[in-house]
Amino acid sequence: MSRMAEQQLYIHGGYTSATSGRTFETINPANGNVLATVQAAGREDVDRAVKSAQQGQKIWAAMTAMERSRILRRAVDILRERNDELAKLETLDTGKAYSETSTVDIVTGADVLEYYAGLIPALEGSQIPLRETLFVYTRREPLGVVAGIGAWNYPIQIALWKSAPALAAGNAMIFKPSEVTPLTALKLAEIYSEAGLPDGVFNVLPGVGAETGQYLTEHPGIAKVSFTGGVASGKKVMANSAASSLKEVTMELGGKSPLIVFDDADLDLAADIAMMANFFSSGQVCTNGTRVFVPAKCKAAFEQKILARVERIRAGDVFDPQTNFGPLVSFPHRDNVLRYIAKGKEEGARVLCGGDVLKGDGFDNGAWVAPTVFTDCRDEMTIVREEIFGPVMSLLTYESEDEVIRRANDTDYGLAAGIVTADLNRAHRVIHQLEAGICWINTWGESPAEMPVGGYKHSGIGRENGVMTLQSYTQVKSIQVEMAKFQSIF
């Protein structure tokens, strides 16, 4: 693909040049080619976007629920009509295989938007009778202008996960995509405008997180920030949001999730789940089950089943429909993953497979890392304690149920957890003791629109998807009504 035209900001229903004068480049990580130069939003651009959003939000909130629902449903239709085009752009920008982006990223994002479009008419308050002449009723009102700050691994899906409930509740959103993968969020803005969203209700500000993101989190005109990213960045976002104007926050942060295989499990099923929990999207999924616990007596058999499945991984041309494994999102990220792999070797973990970059035709110019499995891992190892966010699985053994529950919970993270077992009683008994916000039994990874997702501990605050997320983009107003004559004591 030839280099794209310079990408601008999207404010008030159209493209506009950044006033900052700064730009950055986004690359195709499969081959290192520059895709586009992108303008970076500065402080004045954030001010412009907030003013635009404030204007648009008043128009949007004044529409009826059915009017808002119809506009969002039109956006869903356009997303599905343009699925292949958007998936190709997502593949170029992220490096993910087209077989994945064309069937998951846009598809699931559109599903979430459709879900919230259907919920809009059901967003209602309540009536509370107090006595014969006195009652209270409540209204759920939009917050106003909210900000979404996205991560680089699921660019358009995250933009939809954040914008869908925010817009459904009558808010306007200013979205800052990751500077690593900024392209499809701009296309989403076009689609919202085409669907009939009032100007300013969805603005997109590409830029560097340390600058543009900080301007958004500190801006007094922003009522809430929804952030997806790492724990360290999340803490800064939360601190800035609180210090500036006590903004509400939703945080979807990192994970180091346990996948527990019990001795009664079908090991073929367990191996299939472990593969999806570690190598889907080349391991760049926040919920990945990178700590795989297996009974000591099953270790050798499980290792062989994993190795057999690693042989089925097909890395290569990301637009080949048979390819199911792409490069990492960037060269700096690749280098960071390689540092973790080196640390694992240094600390005594045994490399079962992988452990280096992929080499050969088609790989040498890209950010490729081989699918890597470490065995003989210990809980104190760096690769077991810290989030790697790459195709690196750590195998650990255990002897008892109580032991594995304790070790699974021995982490600052609490995003996800899963177990594989044939015993239904054990399944629920163990899941109820795991300290994680998203749990799977005999499966892994699916996050439908109806399912609230989010973390315990350092893995986040609040939830995305589900009914409760729609409510989190509203504020409750209580109105007390007295129908009898008011009695004053004065």
From Swiss-Prot:
Q: Which residues form the signal peptide?
A: none
In Gene Ontology terms, what is a biological process of this protein?
A: glycine betaine biosynthetic process from choline
Q: This protein's superkingdom? A: Bacteria
Q: Which residues bind NAD(+)?
A: 150-152, 176-179, 230-233, 254, 286, 387
This protein's pathway reads: Amine and polyamine biosynthesis; betaine biosynthesis via choline pathway; betaine from betaine aldehyde: step 1/1
Q: Which UniProt keywords apply?
A: Metal-binding, NAD, NADP, Oxidation, Oxidoreductase, Potassium
Give the note describing cofactor binding and stoichiometry.
Binds 2 potassium ions per subunit.
Q: List, alphabetically, the Pfam families matched.
A: Aldedh
Provide the reaction this enzyme catalyses: betaine aldehyde + NAD(+) + H2O = glycine betaine + NADH + 2 H(+)
Subunit structure of this entry?
Answer: Dimer of dimers.
Q: What is this protein called?
A: Betaine aldehyde dehydrogenase
- What organism does this protein naturally occur in? Escherichia coli (strain SE11)
Which classification does the entry list for the species? Bacteria, Pseudomonadati, Pseudomonadota, Gammaproteobacteria, Enterobacterales
Gene coding for it: betB
